[in-house]
Amino acid sequence: MTVALGRVQERGWFDVLDDWLKRDRFVFIGWSGLLLFPCAFLSIGGWFTGTTFVTSWYTHGLASSYLEGCNFLTAAVSTPADSMGHSLLLLWGPEARGDFTRWCQLGGMWNFVTLHGAFGLIGFMLRQFEIARLVNVRPYNAVAFSGPIAVFVSVFLMYPLGQSSWFFAPSWGVASIFRFLLFVQGFHNLTLNPFHMMGVAGILGGALLCAIHGATVENTLFEDTKDANTFSGFSPTQSEETYSMVTANRFWSQIFGIAFSNKRWLHFFMLFVPVTGLWASAIGLVGIALNMRAYDFVSQEIRAAEDPEFETFYTKNILLNEGLRAWMAPQDQIHENFVFPEEVLPRGNAL
C-alpha cells in the first residue's frame, strides 16, 4: 500500500495579516483601514484639540478656541501664519523644533488636521474599492466619492499652493469657512466663474434628482401591506419589485412629455450630475489658485466709468467686490499693515 503525503504550504506573515485584516467583523478593517482609521482619528482629534485649546492670535490676531470664549460657530483651527509659506510645519521641523506649544502658535495644527484629513478621505475611497472587490460589485461608490475628495484637495491644498502660503486656505471652522467664501468672491469673483456655476448646477441638480426620485418611488409603491406604515411591506430578500417603474414612467411622461424608461440610465444620471458638478468646481478652484480670471466684461466696466447713468448687475457686483477687498484686506491680512486712503474706501450704500 502506498501512502501519499501532501506538503502543507507554509503561510507567511503577509497571508496571516491579510486574513486578519479581511476577517468578517462588525467594523471591517481591510488594508485600506491601515490608512483610513489612523488618519481619520488624528484629523478629527486634532480638530477637537485645536478648537478647544489653540489660539489664532499669533497667526491671524484672532481668538479661535473655546478656551478664549468662542462657541461652536466661531471656533476654528486656523491656517498658519503667512510668513510660514508652504512649509509642512512638521512638529520636529526647523520652525517648531519639537516645541509643541510653539508648533500650535505657528499654525501647525492646521497642517496636521488637513493632511491627515486628506489621506483619511483617500483611505475611505480605497475602503469602498476594497469592499466592492471583496463582495464582487462594481466600484462606482468609490468613483462617486472622488468628487468630494477633488473638492477637498482643490480648496484646502491646491488653492493655497497657488497663492503665497497656507494662510489663504480656509481655516477649519464654520465662521472661518464663511470668511473664505467672501474672500474668494471679493478677490476672484468666483460666482461668475463658469466652473463654479457648473458646480452649483451639479449639486442643486443632484439634490433635485434625489428628491424627485425618492418622491416618485414613494408615490408608486405596490400595496404589499395593510399597515399605515408602508415600510413594513418590504423585505430585503424579496425577489419582486417594490414599486412600479411603468407607473412612474407614465406619470412623468404626462408631466414633462418625456421620462426615464431605463432604471440603469436613470441611476447613472443621478450619479453623473453631482459628481461632474463636484469635479467642475474643483477645476474652477485650481483656476483661481493660479489667479485666472473668468468673464471679465471690460467693455461694460469702461462704459460704466464713462457714463454715470449706465449700470448693470455685473458692474454693481464689481463694485461690491472692490468693497470686499478694501474692507477685508486690512482685517484679514493685518501683518501687511495695509492703509487705504479715505477716498478709495466704500461709504455706506454708495460704494
Curated annotation (Swiss-Prot):
Positions that bind a plastoquinone: H213, F260
EC code(s) of this entry: 1.10.3.9
Subcellular location, principal: membrane
Reactions catalysed according to its record: 2 a plastoquinone + 4 hnu + 2 H2O = 2 a plastoquinol + O2
GO MF assignments: chlorophyll binding; electron transporter, transferring electrons within the cyclic electron transport pathway of photosynthesis activity; iron ion binding; oxygen evolving activity
Keyword Transmembrane helix: yes
Segments passing through the bilayer: 39-59, 123-139, 151-164, 206-226, 277-293
GO BP term (any one): photosynthetic electron transport in photosystem II
Residues that hold pheophytin a according to the record: Q128, N141
Residues bound to Fe cation: H213, H267
InterPro entries to which the protein is assigned, alphabetical: D1/D2, Photo_II_D1/D2_sf, Photo_RC_L/M, Photo_RC_L/M_CS, PSII_PsbD/D2
Oligomer status and interactors: PSII is composed of 1 copy each of membrane proteins PsbA, PsbB, PsbC, PsbD, PsbE, PsbF, PsbH, PsbI, PsbJ, PsbK, PsbL, PsbM, PsbT, PsbX, PsbY, PsbZ, Psb30/Ycf12, peripheral proteins PsbO, CyanoQ (PsbQ), PsbU, PsbV and a large number of cofactors. It forms dimeric complexes.
Physiological role: Photosystem II (PSII) is a light-driven water:plastoquinone oxidoreductase that uses light energy to abstract electrons from H(2)O, generating O(2) and a proton gradient subsequently used for ATP formation. It consists of a core antenna complex that captures photons, and an electron transfer chain that converts photonic excitation into a charge separation. The D1/D2 (PsbA/PsbD) reaction center heterodimer binds P680, the primary electron donor of PSII as well as several subsequent electron acceptors. D2 is needed for assembly of a stable PSII complex.
Additional remark text: 2 of the reaction center chlorophylls (ChlD1 and ChlD2) are entirely coordinated by water.
Name the UniProt record assigns to this protein: Photosystem II D2 protein 2
Organism the protein comes from: Acaryochloris marina (strain MBIC 11017)
Gene that encodes it: psbD2
